[in-house]
């Protein structure tokens, strides 16, 4: 009996080719287009209608049914409110990770099951191993890096539980991006030459600062140097991220050297932005970080007293960094991570993701690091 797969079709080339490949592999395939954001401002930036039209054109071309589902309420409750709270607290969140965990897998999978699906599928560049069982006897599928190292998306998928990975197929995870484009052109799919989306799912391509100030009032404050000297005004700490180069408004400052300016520290308590020159400024360097809650793909992870040796990324596409993970005795579910080498601009609110060779073990949101605090704070 044919197994039924519902593919999350975004109107992009990766999910389009995923659906086509699954058909070729003999599955009974249907598509589902998720609407996760209600356009509230009438700007030209929202591409949801265009994306739906592209998904429908591909579905028609390959001869499958396309369902639609509106998860905007779930998105607002489970993703967007957290996103705003993190920015309001001075951190820099990654909503795409939470969106994958709560919407693109959990809500989508639940909905697909009501439609009689055996599996869901997405266009992510990732792979899954055969079903395994954790110590509680729960079935899960280990998450593996995508074959295309340049496109691997496990960093964004680390918070998806292995029981959901166990019900998911990743057709393009086994091939490289140029081959995906070639297949789309060969099949004459409407999305073959469509450029990859780069914006946060609900912001699209619009200016981030303009979007954010619709929801959070800007709180301007002082810009200070690493010695505490005031040199200007910032527009609101939420608009800046640790390690950011440029966009600070200090170009050509009198008496300063020609070098680029970097965000070194966000003094949230006093609403001050600390800046300085030097790509590897000491205030940006850390060797340890703490995370208060980890999502392990297997639902658990044994961490011995001497620590778990693995590699980690603290941002997408960063080369793997060797580290040791310890249980944080001061937190119920947290960990402390010690890196073998100093790390630059590790940013609270972003995620640390752990790997053992090809296997993505899981990860969590960075709470704080041991980067030095400016001595005037």
Swiss-Prot record:
Residues 151-153, 315-316 are annotated as: Interaction with tRNA. Residues 94-96 are annotated as: Interaction with target base in tRNA. The record marks 124, 350 as: Interaction with tRNA. ATP binds at residues 8-15, 34, 123. Pfam families: tRNA_Me_trans, tRNA_Me_trans_C, tRNA_Me_trans_M. The active site is at 99 (nucleophile), 201 (cysteine persulfide intermediate). Its EC number is 2.8.1.13. The keyword Transferase applies. Transmembrane segments: none annotated. GO terms for biological process: tRNA wobble position uridine thiolation. GO terms for molecular function: ATP binding; tRNA binding; tRNA-uridine 2-sulfurtransferase activity. It comes from the Bacteria. Its main location: cytoplasm. Keywords: ATP-binding, Cytoplasm, Disulfide bond, Nucleotide-binding, RNA-binding, Transferase, tRNA processing, tRNA-binding. It catalyses: S-sulfanyl-L-cysteinyl-[protein] + uridine(34) in tRNA + AH2 + ATP = 2-thiouridine(34) in tRNA + L-cysteinyl-[protein] + A + AMP + diphosphate + H(+). InterPro entries: MnmA-like (IPR004506), MnmA-like_C (IPR046885), MnmA-like_central (IPR046884), MnmA-like_central_sf (IPR023382), Rossmann-like_a/b/a_fold (IPR014729). It is found in: Cytoplasm. Disulfide bonds join 99-201. GO terms for cellular component: cytoplasm. NCBIfam families: PRK00143.1 (NF001138), trmU (TIGR00420). Belongs to the MnmA/TRMU family. Catalyzes the 2-thiolation of uridine at the wobble position (U34) of tRNA, leading to the formation of s(2)U34. This is tRNA-specific 2-thiouridylase MnmA.
């Amino acid at each position: 009996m044919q197994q039924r797969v519902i593919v999350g079709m975004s109107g992009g080339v990766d999910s389009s080719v995923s659906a086509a490949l699954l058909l070729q592999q003999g599955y009974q395939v249907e598509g589902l287009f998720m609407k996760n954001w209600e356009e509230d401002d009438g700007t030209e930036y929202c591409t949801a209608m265009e994306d739906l039209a592209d998904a429908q054109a591909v579905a028609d071309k390959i001869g499958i049914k396309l369902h639609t589902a509106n998860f905007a309420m779930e998105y607002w409750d489970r993703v967007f409110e957290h996103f705003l709270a993190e920015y309001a607290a001075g951190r820099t969140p990654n909503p795409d990770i939470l969106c994958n965990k709560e919407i693109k897998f959990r809500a989508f999978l639940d909905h697909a099951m009501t439609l009689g699906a055996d599996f869901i599928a997405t266009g992510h560049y990732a792979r899954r191993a055969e079903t395994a069982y954790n110590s509680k006897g729960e079935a899960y599928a280990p998450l593996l890096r995508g074959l295309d190292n340049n496109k691997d998306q496990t960093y964004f998928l680390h918070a998806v539980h292995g029981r959901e990975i166990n019900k998911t197929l990743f057709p393009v995870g086994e091939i490289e991006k140029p081959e995906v484009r070639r297949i789309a052109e060969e099949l004459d799919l409407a999305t073959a030459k469509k450029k990859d989306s780069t914006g946060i799912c609900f912001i699209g391509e619009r200016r981030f600062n303009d979007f954010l100030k619709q929801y959070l009032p800007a709180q301007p404050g002082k810009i200070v140097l690493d010695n505490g000297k005031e040199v200007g005004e910032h527009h609101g700490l939420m608009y800046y991220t640790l390690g950011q180069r440029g966009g600070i408004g200090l170009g050509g400052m009198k008496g300063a050297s020609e070098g680029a300016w970097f965000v070194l520290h966000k003094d949230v308590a006093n609403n001050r932005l600390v800046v300085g020159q030097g790509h590897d400024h000491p205030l940006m360097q850390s060797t340890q970080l703490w995370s208060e809650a980890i999502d392990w793909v297997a639902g658990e992870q044994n961490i011995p007293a001497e620590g778990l040796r693995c590699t980690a990324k603290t941002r997408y596409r960063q080369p793997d960094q060797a580290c040791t993970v310890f249980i944080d005795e001061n937190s119920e579910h947290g960990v402390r991570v010690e890196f073998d080498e100093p790390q630059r601009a590790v940013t609270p609110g972003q995620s640390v993701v752990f790997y053992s060779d090809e296997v993505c073990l899981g990860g969590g949101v960075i709470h704080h690091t041991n980067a030095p605090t400016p001595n005037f704070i």
